[in-house]
Amino acid sequence: MANHKSAAKRARQSIRKTAVNNARKSTVKTAEKKLVKAIEAKDLKALPELLKNFSSQVMKAAKTGVIKKETASRKISRLSTRASATK
């Protein structure tokens, strides 16, 4: 338990931010799973939209500091390469 008002506030903020960050990570993982599933199924119709959505989610996570920018770039690069190889 925090002894100072400011410490209590920081604890509340930490809980809220953790929830937001976990939600963002979850959306990134879900988008990644959908994209990988489409790549493995060779679903060429859904692939461009899923890749666009995945890239968007990953860059939003990187922009807000949930994941590192290098990690985001690596994920996008690898999955883009896999997606283009299925065509």
UniProtKB/Swiss-Prot annotation:
Residues 1-15 have a biased composition (Basic residues). GO terms for cellular component: small ribosomal subunit. It comes from the Bacteria. Disulfide bonds: none annotated. Residues 19-29 have a biased composition (Polar residues). Residues 1-29 are annotated as: Disordered. Binds directly to 16S ribosomal RNA. This is Small ribosomal subunit protein bS20. It comes from Bdellovibrio bacteriovorus (strain ATCC 15356 / DSM 50701 / NCIMB 9529 / HD100). The lineage of its organism: Bacteria, Pseudomonadati, Bdellovibrionota, Bdellovibrionia, Bdellovibrionales. The gene is rpsT.
